[in-house]
Amino acid sequence: MAKEWGYADHNGPDHWHEFYPIAKGDNQSPIELHTKDINHDPSLKAWTASYDPGSAKTILNNGRTCRVVFDDTYDRSMLRGGPLTAPYRLRQFHLHWGSSDDHGSEHTVDGVKYAAELHLVHWNPKYNTYGGALKQPDGIAVVGVFLKIGREKGEFQLFLDALDKIKTKGKEAPFTNFDPSCLFPTCRDYWTYRGSFTTPPCEECIVWLLLKEPITVSSDQVAKLRSLFSSAENEPPVPLVRNWRPPQPLKGRVVRASFK
């Protein structure tokens, strides 16, 4: 079944193209960042996020990640600037992580794998609907934040505490009054390139903003992500401990840096 993709050997990233041919396309994500090959582009502006904490609605476990969903029916929580030519609406954020602290991020920087990677997914309302934006090369903007291991991050704990309500696949719970900009690093420097979703159908519609500076969370906090299950409540328990796609070929794309 096409919709039964996952991260196991039989349905994992190596098989996605069998059902979703674009997964072998020319603009796939994630990628390896080699900083010596990336040039500073002085035309790249600063970016800003103005998020309404009341637009957060629910948190859910879809068996592949945990996701927080936002009200995107109007311009409530917006991303502006950077490489973007228009304001984009926040729709959801989710994370990718690994089975241990030494890996889990999808993008890598000079060979460094971080413990996890946060993706904030926004869409361009000039295309009227999210579905319409998925069909456009600049329809979606994703801010990627790396998580490294160190001291605990209190703001991240607010989110983690809600995971107890969505332990198993298919669970959903109210989750509001949360401003995800509290999960951004102090430094707003970023790399940008044209890419895709890192999960099927792997549509090539994304302007990526990858933040150079990781945020620091504790080992226990990342372990909390691994306490989720990819199985439903009535099924034999399968821990959700590996949900990252490996880097894809750059195929001539240019990565630009907002900083020197």
Swiss-Prot record:
PROSITE patterns found in the cross-reference section: ALPHA_CA_1 (PS00162), ALPHA_CA_2 (PS51144)
Residue positions binding Zn(2+): 94, 96, 119
Cell compartment(s), UniProt: Cytoplasm
Leading EC class: lyase
InterPro entries, per the entry: CA_dom (IPR001148), CA_dom_sf (IPR036398), Carbonic_anhydrase_a-class (IPR023561), Carbonic_anhydrase_a-class_CS (IPR018338)
Recorded GO CC terms: cytoplasm; cytosol
Chain residue ranges for the region called Involved in proton transfer: 64-67
Activity regulation, per record: Inhibited by acetazolamide.
GO molecular function: carbonate dehydratase activity; nickel cation binding; zinc ion binding
EC number: 4.2.1.1
Residues recorded with modification Phosphoserine: 29, 43, 50, 55, 219
Biological process, per Gene Ontology: response to bacterium
Modified residues (Phosphothreonine): 73, 129, 176, 216
CDD domains assigned to the protein according to its UniProt record, in alphabetical order: alpha_CA_I_II_III_XIII (cd03119)
Reactions listed under catalytic activity: hydrogencarbonate + H(+) = CO2 + H2O
Residue positions where N-acetylalanine is found in the record: 2
Residues covered by the Alpha-carbonic anhydrase domain: 3-259
Residues recorded as bearing S-glutathionyl cysteine in the entry: 182, 187
Post-translational modification: S-thiolated both by thiol-disulfide exchange with glutathione disulfide and by oxyradical-initiated S-thiolation with reduced glutathione. S-glutathionylated in hepatocytes under oxidative stress.
Highest taxon listed in the record's lineage: Eukaryota
Pfam families for this protein: Carb_anhydrase (PF00194)
Function: Reversible hydration of carbon dioxide.
Protein name: Carbonic anhydrase 3
Organism, as annotated: Equus caballus
